[in-house]
Amino acid sequence: LPLTAVAEALDHAITVDPNWTGTTITSSQNNLHHDISTTHINGSVAANKFTKFQVGEKHLVDMHLPTNTNHLVNFVDNKISVNGTVNALKGSKVGGNLYFVSPKGMIVGKTGVINAGSLTAVITTDDAYKKYSELSDKKLPLGLGQKEEEALATLQKMQQGEVPLNPAGVITVNGSINAGNRITLAASQIHLESGAKLSNLETDFKDLVHIKEGQNVVTQSSVSDAIVTREADDGSGDILLLARSDSSATGSIAGSVTKQKVEAKVKVAKGAFVKSRGNVNGSSMAGNGVYDIEKTLRPSGYEQLSAEEKAKKDREIGHFVSDGKHKLLDVSSEIRIDGVITAAKDLDVNSVAENRLVKSSTTMADLSTGLTLEILGTATPFNEAVYYADLKTSSLISIGNEASLSADQNLSLDSVADTKLEAGTSTSLFNLFNTELTQKVPSVAAIVALADSSSTVNVAGSLKAGKDLTITSADDLTVEASATAATKESKAVQTSILVAKLKGTSDINVQSSALLDIVKDAGKVEISSNQNSSVKTESSVVVQDGSYGGLAFNYTELDTHSNVLLNTGFTNEALEASVTAKNVTEDLTIKADNAVGASGISKLL
């Protein structure tokens, strides 16, 4: 075979898990056309499991939904690759809800095409994948539930992206995804490269389901009627691009001075198109801790709140459960759009970076005093307690100068950076090695707390809204840090040192090249930047009678700003228009306490 033929042959590899004997692949047309069917059925849900799913160029795969089923779930152990055409067929029509679930990622190449009634692709964690795909005694996917309603509930969560996602998982699209209904892509990073096309406007697939070279059909599908099967479920016309990552894969990095990174990213490159007959939601979320899938952070009565109240409460309680361990962490959430996105309803672009280190200490042993930051120190001959935390948090939405975002109804850009650092260190309350020698060894409690939190929205391209246009950026910075040197029955010098360098910024930059296109008197325009900070730091020493003395030192530096730069106007008059920038310091408390002497330095910029 010539090298090109060998490469093409290697590129195509679809292998069924040997335990899934109900999945059948039948090939024809010189081994370029492949029909896939399954007998693994749970009510309206059918499933396949593959060790490999690589569709080569010029290869066409027709995936058949069994009679009376609406959902076809495909579990793939390795990275999914589509360089040919994949059709989901319900009867003789393109239709049904097609799912791809893998822990390793997915790529749709430049020649890749997926046609379905709806498509959901999720890149899960290894543990979640094993749970979802494992076979039960009934030869059904255990994670999809043994009852149909349980399976449907799990699939709904997949469509919403409310499943554990692999922090290293990536979905890349260079080709086309065509659907008549919902499209969901969920991973830690979503890349729509130049030439990518996502559309759920399709009703006629006759020019999409076959592989052609010019006007000639190279590989023909089994489709006899290419009209898509429409579904009437709520939100069926929505497109969700969800990138989410957490610190579950980074480890606690104890003893390390190397900062690790948690990154979520959505990219829509120049030359990429997203078109929806419903809503479009581009969402990026990155956080310190584990994403709260089970919503354990939500208080009782949450479901009775209004939508606006729920959003406010979610902002307050956060989306990630902190374990108090990730002290050196860079959390980054980013959405970059240089292509075209159009929505027949609402278009929402949301970026959230959440870096919360809560109740973190040197020893993680809290005193039963009711005080948040008092903790036990180390019980060693050398009574020292040193704590170092460095948190960087950044949320960015960037709309490039050739980007075009259009919504027939509301259009919103919302960026949020949320940094919360609760940290304390203390020498041991009782020195278990209290000897005449150790009485002369100084006790030292030292804490260094660094936090850099920023939220930014940059707009250089076109924004068109049929109703409301909203551009918001918010940065929340909350720090409580304490260093305490207090050892009973010790004459040793007690020293407490606290150094905190803190920065919080919120910026909106609308450049002169930007077009803010609104319909006259149809809606409101809001451009709002908010920076909120609350800082409490305390360095304290408690010395005993007859001690050699003590020193408490506190250096706290806080630098915050909030800016809106608007270098263009609106194309028409709005019902209401507001442009605001707020910088609010809710609390700034800096203390250095010592019964013998104290030294405190503060710097506020």
Where are these regions (language model features)?
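Low-complexity, glycine- and small/polar-enriched segments
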Residues: 3-605
